[in-house]
């Protein structure tokens, strides 16, 4: 079982990480003459119970006075050191540049040790109502929070991939380093529900300051915050 070889050469980063993983699963099922479950072929790949999502939505609305007619934008500025990320000032520029057909509420999420940077970002948000939500109740509860988002914004980090598994609309920022590119760590949500930015070719591969934040705000606003959600 554990001595069947499938050569992948992941270091070339020719496709997303999840596709490499799918290749392993497909080969395993093929070797054992098991059909690939249809549910594995399209997102969402994580479907929380409706009652759990409704309860979490009500709790957030009560805790942060989020009005029913608003679009909730969740932004997770922390990265856990997993990859290069935008600065707090860039995230603030991005959020302040978002335009929507409804009022926006910006919920800044933070994990352990990230509350200081989240609070710093909160102080820079001028255009929209905002609050900080510190996640202390575990992964599943945090996923239920993320699932409330009309748009989820972050660098290449774990919460981004939770949002992708939930098929949330995502706006993500990556370095251009081959092992960390938008392609290699692409989220698993529908293509129409994701946007990704990285430093341009003329900039250094990890120069996150070279990303055009104004363009990102415009594209995210047009694709995700006006009209019906994609997908």
Predicted regions and their residues:
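Catalytic machinery of carbohydrate-active enzymes
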Residues: 1-231
């Amino acid at each position: 079982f554990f001595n069947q070889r499938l050569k992948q050469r992941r270091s070339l980063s020719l496709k997303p990480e999840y596709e490499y993983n799918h290749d392993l699963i497909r080969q395993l099922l093929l070797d054992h003459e098991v059909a690939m479950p249809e549910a594995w072929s399209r997102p969402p790949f994580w479907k929380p119970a409706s009652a759990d999502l409704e309860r979490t939505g009500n709790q957030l609305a009560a805790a942060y006075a989020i009005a029913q007619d608003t679009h909730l934008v969740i932004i997770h500025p922390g990265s856990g050191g997993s990859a290069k990320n935008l600065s707090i000032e860039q995230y603030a520029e991005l959020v302040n540049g978002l335009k929507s057909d409804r009022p926006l509420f910006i919920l800044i999420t933070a994990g352990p040790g990230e509350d200081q940077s989240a609070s710093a970002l909160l102080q820079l948000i001028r255009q929209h109502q905002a609050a900080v939500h510190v996640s202390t109740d575990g992964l599943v509860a945090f996923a239920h929070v993320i699932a409330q988002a009309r748009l989820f914004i972050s660098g290449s980090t774990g919460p981004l991939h939770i949002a992708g598994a939930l098929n949330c609309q995502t706006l993500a920022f990556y370095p251009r380093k081959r092992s960390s590119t938008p392609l290699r760590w692409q989220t698993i949500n529908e293509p129409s529900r994701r946007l990704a930015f990285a430093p341009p070719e003329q900039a250094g591969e990890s120069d996150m300051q070279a990303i055009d934040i104004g363009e990102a705000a415009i594209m995210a606003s047009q694709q995700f915050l006006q009209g019906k959600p994609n997908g």
